């Protein structure tokens, strides 16, 4: 994976078509109850290119979906953590929201599989714990209920199907107030 001038991860269009189609097929047909041929047809990407990106395993494709959720949706990569440190919450949340807009089944995948007793479910629950740790690192004085409030606000913002960039701005301002009040590490710039 390469990064552009702003440090955003760049994956080509074929990667996203395959990932989006695999997540949709898995959600609609059931866990791993689809074929690579169906995936190729749906994504309009050749099987050889699918194998190049993901290998021959359907599970490896879904694991890549979990990786994307961790890095891009939850923001566990270095660049996104740095954005939080710089007080750029709106930018970080907007990137997560835009990903959900481009990958409409990502939310369903996450919500459906997070408690499944399999490798995907376990990985998603692990990402939740990592996000809780990230919030705790930035807001060390918050108790568990307050961290859950930040978590639910964050995921509500990015998963809400009727959100707009304008509504995101209002929600992010709320989170910025929480961070400015409780975080010794971050001094976000609040707009009036």
What are these regions (language model features)?
Residues 77-102, 150:
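Hydrophobic alpha-helical connector segments
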Residues 7-21, 146:
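N-terminal positioning helix adjacent to the helix-turn-helix/winged-helix DNA-binding module
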Residues 78, 114-148, 170-180:
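Amphipathic alpha-helical packing segments from all-alpha helical-bundle domains
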Residues 1-13, 188-192:
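N-terminal intrinsically disordered/low-complexity leader segments
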Residues 94-122, 159-160:
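Amphipathic alpha-helical segments used for helix-helix packing
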Residues 17, 25-60:
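Helix-turn-helix
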Residues 16, 90, 94, 143-155:
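Short, well-structured alpha-helical segments
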Residues 61-69, 123:
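Alpha-helical DNA-contacting segments of helix-turn-helix folds
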